[in-house]
C-alpha cells in the first residue's frame, strides 16, 4: 500500500539543508530536548566540515544561554509561556527595564526577543538548575576543545547528552 501523506521526516530526508539551517535546527532540537535529533544534526554539521568550536559557539551556547535567561525571567516574573516566539517581546515590555538590562542585544541595541521567545516556548522542558549546569558544561567543553587532544565529536556529543538527557530523580 502506498501512502499519500508526506511527513516532516520525509522532507528532512529528501531536502538538503544549508549549514545555517542545520545550526538553527540543532538549537531547536536542544530546546525541544530531542537527544536523537540533536546528535544526528551534530553529526551532519561535522560531516559538512563545521568546526566543533564553531558549533559550540554558534548553536549550543546561545541556545542554552537563551533557555536559561528565558526560564529565569519566566520564573522570577511569573511569565506565561508564549504561543509564538514573537509574542514574548510584548511580554518583556511589561516587566521593569532593569529586569531585562542583562539580556543579549541585537546590533541596533534592542533585545533579541525572537530567540528568547523560542527559548521561552521550550523553557518548561528544563529546570533552572539543569540549565545552569548546562552552561557550565558548555564552558568545560570549550576548554576541552581548545586545550586538549580529545576527539571533538566525542566532546560535543557528551555535552549534548549532558544538556538534553533527563536527570533521574
Residue ranges and their predicted role:
Residues 13-18:
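Short helix-capping and inter-helix turn/linker motifs at the boundaries of alpha-helical repeat units
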Residues 2-10, 22-25, 29, 35-169:
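C-terminal alpha-helical interaction modules of replication/initiation AAA+ assemblies
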Amino acid at each position: 500500500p502506498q501512502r499519500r501523506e508526506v511527513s516532516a521526516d520525509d522532507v528532512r530526508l529528501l531536502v538538503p539543508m544549508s549549514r545555517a539551517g542545520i545550526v538553527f535546527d540543532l538549537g531547536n532540537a536542544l530546546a525541544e530536548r530531542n537527544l536523537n535529533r540533536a546528535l544526528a544534526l551534530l553529526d551532519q554539521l561535522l560531516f559538512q566540515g563545521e568546526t566543533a568550536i564553531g558549533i559550540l559557539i554558534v548553536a549550543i551556547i546561545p541556545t542554552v544561554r537563551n533557555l536559561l535567561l528565558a526560564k529565569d525571567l519566566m520564573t522570577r516574573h511569573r511569565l506565561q509561556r508564549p504561543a509564538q516566539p514573537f509574542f514574548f517581546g510584548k511580554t518583556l515590555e511589561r516587566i521593569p527595564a532593569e529586569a531585562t538590562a542583562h539580556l543579549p542585544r541585537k546590533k541596533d541595541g534592542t533585545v533579541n526577543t525572537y530567540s528568547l521567545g523560542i527559548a521561552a516556548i521550550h523553557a518548561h522542558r528544563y529546570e533552572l538548575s539543569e540549565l545552569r549546569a548546562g552552561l557550565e558544561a558548555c564552558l568545560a567543553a570549550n576548554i576541552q576543545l581548545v586545550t586538549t587532544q580529545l576527539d571533538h565529536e566525542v566532546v560535543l556529543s557528551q555535552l549534548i547528552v549532558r544538556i538534553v538527557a533527563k536527570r533521574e530523580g
